Amino acid sequence: MDEITAIREGIEAAFERAYNEYHVKTFRFFLKRVRMHETAKELTQQTFIKLWRSRHTLSESFSLDTQIFTIAGTILIDHLRKQAS
């Protein structure tokens, strides 16, 4: 079973492996854009919470990396919109 299928099926160990593999890269993605350490940490956390909560929508057609950064991009846009209003 691959990681995407395992996460989609709710196997926490697979989610933990994905978190361990991608959380630093995700944090750096946010830090580069928001330039605030705590905000980048919060947005990273939101990304992985959303990944877990929407795990049933994960697709085998796209890499896990692509799907995580799609979520991260959406969260960043939402954050920036809130900041602008």
Model-based region annotation:
Residues 19-20, 27, 37-54:
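Conserved RNAP core-binding helix
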Residues 1-5:
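Intrinsic, short, N-terminal disordered tails of RNA polymerase sigma-factor systems
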